[in-house]
């Protein structure tokens, strides 16, 4: 019978409650261990055999069991006889020294046993007031054990006798570190014992295991998350993590590695996303890596989060995701879109979402095409990649990010003056909703479905309220009034200021600022011809009016000063007009040729007050004066204040002034020639690199909206997955409460040269009705189409059954409640029975599906427009 069996046989309730018995038994075990240690100490050449090793490990395990019995039995923290023996004899230190001298074949066995001993000390400590890890005779050997496992942050530690798989000792070591981190959460004071002298061994040792396979990697990630959550308020630990470790780099590098293992093609039709069985684990690893990255960003110190966001952008988005979208393989591009969409829908931490938005709006290809325009370009084609592109764009829309919507939708609408403020005011009227709602319901084909309008009224109201709440903190309302630097043109002067709730219309987004003289003529203080002083006398300027005007300036809309000379000839009144209708009236004097030439001289005498001074009018257009008589006549009407100077003094003043002006003009011309020569030399060296948008280079139309309208127009030719994703995109886009978008999407336009949604739907309806009349038993095709849609919906629900429940899960409408990303893994692909279709059968099937989808779309749009006056 082994000694362990003997120990178990002697176990009794009396033994369990007798500390003296513990001490006696401990002494016996220690004598055995001490003798084994002494043999190696006396004779360094002594070779330890297997039985000798097992005897030491077994007795050490029993000694630690007795130690934990003593520690847990004490009501208050105190050092008992057994713990004191560990301290005075330095038992753990001596055992580590002995084990390091073992042969390689025995060292791994001893290493694993020591890890289990420490795991027992950590996990079996049930006393809240006395954790043995605070004692140096216990803590220092633990640190030495960590050094034993120390290795590079990225590469595995692999000895000659080991392969690259995680060993059993490493698995137990990660479990030990995880339990230590759990103790840190239970007692935060322990953090000071493990983080000292700018060293955090427990955290550093976890980094190489972050992306290990199986439970080992999950335990390491959980442990790191626990550490960073406990130290979220500790700046010194945050600095250590970002500056002294490679944690942030490994985090994003591992994410990139998970992405590189994903399949280069996705099964299914683009709406149904399936992967081969061999890639299931890789997809699960990628999803877990995204969740871990997001969880770290939500719990860690702000400095750590900022560092992670930086590497997430540079190391993952721009170096991995972006190149995948620039390949020539459309299958791989479509798969990459699915993976990016999974990233967008998984990550919710604002800084990481901001990084994704930054890539969408600023990254360009070699031809200068912005990333989101690249995605939009893949919509054309109607294949699987087109379907995934529509779904990815829909995920952009669901972000409800003002910058994204400004780039994709609002910027082209605002800069191309899609509507006046008077036209947009119609959006607020309830009568518009009833009229337009009926117009969209009239677009339902004659062969349409039984009306489910009440369901759409309920679901759209919920989503419109949620979308309005998402947009509540946007900077601008995009209603043609508070549109910032893109104020829409007014139909009249009175209309220019209608619905203005603040005194000055200006923009914090504008690229041009007239401060501090933005509300005066030009960039200089106001000049009143009534205050002309005597010739040769300095003018006494009165800044009272200017100060009053400056006091009226709305500080919320003041822009930083800029150097107007940088704009050169680009800064013309016609371009400034896009900034603000009121600002335009004040800054038109910036260009002298435009302001002076545009208005002739006006000389008006007062007809209502004969006592008014002669200079009660404003003169302009002095460049039009070509004869001396007119010039004298104008001067005679001015009142000159002060005493008249002698003619000699006046002539001297004129000559002096003329000479100074002539000299200044010569110097100016010489300087301009010199600057021109320098610019010609410097110009080849200059290279302007810009990201994002120019303040002048705007597209004529929104590429996204244009693509959507083109897709609706070809509804009968498109495949079912494409039409479904397209209508889902329209459904999400139409819920935005901004008046300019609502007007563009829903209201009919007088301009017949441009396509509009309502007219397109009417055209598609007419086409479907005509085609339906020529198809025999079209009602049967409608029933088959409904069965196909139901079967497809069942497959998608089956794929998404294990995914987190969402608010859209029980929505019975067609364009809401879908899950674009299935959980990792592949489910059986069920298909309805099919046969060799003739060309006529394909046409009939597509027409029936188009009729069903159009019926749902019209009901959805009618429900939205009917409630816009209540939401907007």
From Swiss-Prot:
Region described as Disordered: spans on this chain: 800-841
Stretches with biased composition (Basic and acidic residues): 829-841
Domain of life: Eukaryota
Matching InterPro entries: FHIP (IPR019384), FHIP_C (IPR045669)
Annotated Pfam families: DUF5917 (PF19314), RAI16-like (PF10257)
Record-linked PANTHER family: FHIP FAMILY PROTEIN CG3558, RAI16 PROTEIN-RELATED
Family label: Belongs to the FHIP family.
Protein name, entry field: FHIP family protein CBG19667
């Amino acid at each position: 019978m082994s000694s362990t069996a003997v120990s178990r046989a002697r176990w009794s309730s009396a033994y369990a409650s007798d500390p003296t018995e513990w001490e006696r038994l401990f002494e016996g075990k220690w004598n055995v261990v001490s003798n084994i240690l002494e043999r190696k100490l006396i004779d360094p050449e002594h070779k330890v055999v297997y039985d000798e090793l097992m005897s030491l490990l077994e007795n050490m395990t029993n000694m630690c069991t007795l130690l934990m019995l003593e520690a847990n039995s004490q009501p208050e923290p105190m050092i008992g006889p057994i713990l004191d023996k560990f301290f005075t004899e330095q038992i753990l230190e001596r055992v580590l020294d002995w084990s390091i001298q073992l042969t390689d074949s025995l060292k791994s066995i001893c290493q694993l046993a020591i890890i289990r001993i420490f795991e027992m000390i950590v996990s079996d400590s049930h006393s809240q007031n006395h954790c043995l890890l605070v004692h140096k005779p216990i803590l220092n050997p633990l640190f030495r054990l960590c050094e034993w496992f120390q290795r590079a942050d990225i590469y595995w530690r692999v000895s000659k006798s080991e392969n690259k798989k995680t060993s059993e000792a490493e698995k137990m070591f990660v479990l030990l570190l995880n339990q230590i981190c759990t103790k840190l959460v239970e007692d935060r004071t322990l953090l000071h014992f493990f983080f000292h002298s700018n060293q955090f061994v427990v955290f550093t040792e976890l980094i190489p295991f972050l992306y290990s396979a199986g439970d080992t990697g999950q335990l390491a990630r959980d442990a790191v998350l626990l550490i960073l959550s406990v130290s979220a308020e500790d700046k010194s630990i945050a600095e250590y993590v970002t500056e002294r470790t490679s944690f942030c780099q490994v985090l994003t590098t591992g994410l990139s590695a998970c992405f590189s293992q994903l399949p280069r093609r996705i099964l299914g039709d683009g709406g149904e996303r399936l992967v081969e069985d061999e890639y299931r684990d890789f997809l699960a690893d990628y999803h877990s890596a995204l969740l871990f990255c997001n969880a770290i960003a939500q719990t860690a110190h702000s400095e750590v989060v900022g560092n992670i966001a930086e590497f997430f952008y540079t190391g993952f988005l721009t170096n991995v995701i972006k190149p995948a979208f620039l390949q020539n393989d459309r299958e791989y591009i479509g798969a990459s879109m699915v993976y990016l969409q999974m990233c967008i829908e998984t990550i919710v931490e604002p800084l990481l979402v901001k990084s994704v938005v930054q890539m969408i709006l600023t990254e360009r290809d070699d031809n200068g095409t912005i990333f989101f325009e690249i995605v939009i370009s893949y919509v054309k084609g109607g294949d699987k990649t087109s379907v995934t592109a529509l779904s990815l764009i829909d995920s952009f829309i669901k972000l409800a990010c003002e910058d994204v919507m400004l780039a994709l939708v609002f910027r082209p609408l605002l800069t191309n003056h899609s509507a006046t403020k008077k036209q947009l005011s119609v959006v607020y009227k309830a009568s518009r909703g009833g009229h337009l709602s009926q117009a969209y319901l009239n677009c339902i084909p004659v062969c349409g479905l039984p009306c489910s309008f009440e369901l759409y009224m309920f679901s759209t109201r919920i989503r419109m309220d949620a979308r309005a709440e998402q947009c509540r903190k946007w900077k601008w309302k995009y209603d043609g009034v508070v549109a910032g630097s893109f104020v829409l043109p007014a139909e009249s002067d009175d209309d220019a200021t209608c619905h203005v709730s603040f005194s000055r219309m200006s923009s914090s987004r504008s690229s041009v600022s007239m401060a501090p003289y933005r509300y005066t003529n030009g960039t200089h203080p106001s000049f009143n011809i009534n205050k002309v002083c005597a010739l040769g006398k300095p003018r006494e300027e009165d800044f009272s009016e200017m100060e009053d005007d400056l006091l009226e300036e709305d500080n919320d809309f003041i822009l930083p000063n800029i150097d107007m000379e940088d704009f050169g000839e680009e800064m013309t009144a016609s371009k400034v007009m896009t900034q603000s209708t009121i600002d335009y009236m004040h800054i038109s004097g910036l260009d002298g040729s435009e302001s002076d030439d545009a208005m002739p001289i006006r000389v008006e005498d007062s007809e209502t007050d004969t006592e008014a001074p002669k200079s009660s009018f404003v003169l302009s257009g002095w460049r039009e004066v070509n004869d001396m008589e007119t010039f004298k006549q104008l001067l005679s009407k001015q009142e000159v204040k002060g005493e008249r100077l002698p003619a000699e003094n006046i002539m001297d003043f004129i000559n002096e002034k003329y000479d100074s002006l002539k000299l200044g003009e010569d110097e100016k011309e010489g300087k301009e020639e010199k600057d021109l020569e320098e610019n010609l030399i410097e110009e080849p060296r200059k290279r302007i690199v810009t990201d994002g948008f120019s303040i002048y280079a705007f597209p004529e139309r929104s590429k996204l909206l244009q693509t959507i309208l083109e897709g609706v127009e070809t509804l009968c030719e498109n495949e079912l997955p494409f039409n479904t994703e397209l209508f889902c995109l329209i459904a999400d886009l139409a819920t935005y409460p901004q008046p300019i978008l609502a007007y563009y999407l829903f209201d009919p336009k007088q301009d017949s040269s441009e396509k509009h949604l309502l007219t397109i739907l009417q055209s598609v309806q007419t086409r479907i009705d005509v085609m339906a009349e020529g198809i025999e038993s079209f009602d049967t095709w409608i029933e088959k189409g409904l069965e196909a849609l139901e079967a497809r919906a069942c497959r998608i629900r089956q794929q998404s059954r294990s995914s987190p429940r969402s608010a859209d899960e029980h929505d019975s409408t067609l364009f809401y409640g879908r899950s674009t990303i299935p959980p990792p893994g592949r489910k059986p692909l069920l298909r309805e029975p099919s046969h060799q279709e003739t060309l006529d059968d394909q046409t009939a099937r597509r027409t029936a599906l188009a009729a069903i989808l159009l019926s749902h779309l019209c009901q959805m749009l009618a429900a939205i427009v009917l409630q816009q006056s209540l939401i907007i």
